[in-house]
């Protein structure tokens, strides 16, 4: 296995992953293709999902900043224009969750507004701006204002999740996932602009999910809540593999939060309150994830475990391993605790052997518990290898500190 403690190795891996997508993912008529088989063949040319549309902008903006290829910057601009022109409804300001793109025109397939989607629009705008797309600066403020107006619930200090296309109906479902990615986006917006209100919103989201809400579940983070932010233990119990709202504790979200908490800590002097709580919570969440979810027999972290602590979904997902790699590195550098380097190496060894496609590039999306493949669909809507390349960028960032 390559030495993933070497920054050059991480950059090579990003370049190899980008090579799976670029340039085949770019649709000259607008945006990107979103559905790829293992060998890179596109198996759906028209369906465009907001999450993929935004994540591709992140991918290209980050790639441009690290590799300085003008084609990457052009692709980031191309993707940002698609978000604005195809997903965004100029009459409502909302963003369609899914559109059909044919002959240069977008037709909404699902015009529902999701806070999760807006978080990724904000993330895309922030990274595009950092890459040099000047017009993205105004889009950052516009998207934040939309999230605040339509989804922010001051009495709970968190964002609601979903609203109708015309914004008149707000779904009673509340979820931690949208708030976690909103925190990520707010951090990116702060780092892009220096505007403190983004950092303070990220700080509030992080505390309210990982401390206040976690206190309702013995310090762990449940995914689903009622409108008053009491835990809904039964939501999607009959649909445990739901793509964005699975029933279970999600160890991948524990480690993702651990990473975000320590990203917040880096800006400790600019936070509103003490940063003393961030490291202990990050360690506790990471440690809970690997304790409950690591598979001693086949390796890798399982997807989900139930309230009783037992694994309820033993499939292995690419993003769970990737986010845990990033969190392990951040914790290792922050604490000096060698056990986190052990986890970093163990997770890379597992992922390199089972998830990385050494023939065609990029990572497989999902494997069975025994690491056998479940599908030849490497990158359906939502994947884009944003998590895998993002993890590499995160590790590169902490190596540079």
What are these regions (language model features)?
Residues 1-401:
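Glycan-recognition and catalytic cores of secretory/periplasmic carbohydrate-active enzymes
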């Amino acid at each position: 296995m390559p030495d993933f403690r070497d920054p050059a190795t991480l950059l090579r891996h990003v370049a190899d992953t980008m090579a799976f997508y670029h340039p085949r993912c770019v649709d000259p008529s607008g945006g990107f293709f979103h559905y790829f088989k293992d060998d890179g063949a596109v198996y759906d040319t028209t369906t465009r999902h907001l999450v993929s549309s935004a994540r591709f902008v992140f991918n290209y903006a980050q790639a441009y900043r690290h590799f300085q290829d003008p084609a990457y910057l052009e692709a980031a601009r191309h993707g940002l224009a698609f978000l604005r022109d195809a997903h965004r409804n100029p009459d409502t300001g909302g963003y369609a969750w899914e559109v059909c793109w044919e002959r240069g025109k977008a037709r909404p397939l699902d015009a529902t507004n999701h806070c999760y989607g807006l978080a990724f629009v904000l993330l895309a705008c922030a990274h595009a701006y950092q890459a040099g797309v000047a017009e993205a600066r105004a889009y950052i403020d516009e998207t934040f204002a939309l999230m605040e107006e339509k989804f922010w619930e001051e009495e709970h200090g968190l964002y609601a999740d979903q609203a109708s296309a015309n914004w008149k109906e707000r779904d009673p479902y509340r979820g931690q996932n949208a708030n976690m990615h909103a925190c990520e986006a707010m951090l990116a917006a702060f780092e892009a602009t220096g505007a403190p209100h983004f950092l303070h919103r990220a700080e509030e989201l992080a505390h309210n999910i990982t401390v206040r809400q976690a206190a309702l579940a013995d310090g762990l983070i449940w995914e689903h809540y009622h409108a008053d932010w009491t835990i809904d233990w039964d939501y999607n119990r009959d649909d445990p593999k739901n793509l964005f709202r699975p029933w279970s504790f999600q160890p991948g979200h524990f480690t993702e939060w651990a990473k975000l908490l320590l990203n917040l800590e880096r800006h400790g002097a600019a936070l509103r309150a003490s940063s003393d709580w961030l490291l202990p919570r990050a360690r506790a969440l990471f440690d809970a994830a690997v304790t409950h979810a690591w598979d001693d027999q086949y390796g890798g972290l399982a997807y989900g475990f139930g309230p009783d602590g037992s694994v309820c979904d033993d499939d292995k997902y690419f993003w769970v391993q990737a986010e845990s790699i990033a969190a392990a590195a951040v914790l290792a550098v922050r604490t000096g605790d060698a056990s986190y380097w052990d986890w970093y190496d163990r997770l890379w060894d597992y992922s390199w052997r089972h998830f990385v496609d050494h023939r065609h590039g990029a990572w497989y999306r999902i494997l069975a518990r025994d690491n056998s493949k479940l599908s030849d669909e490497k990158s359906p809507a939502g994947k884009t290898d944003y998590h895998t390349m993002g993890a590499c960028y995160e590790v590169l960032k902490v190596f540079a500190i």
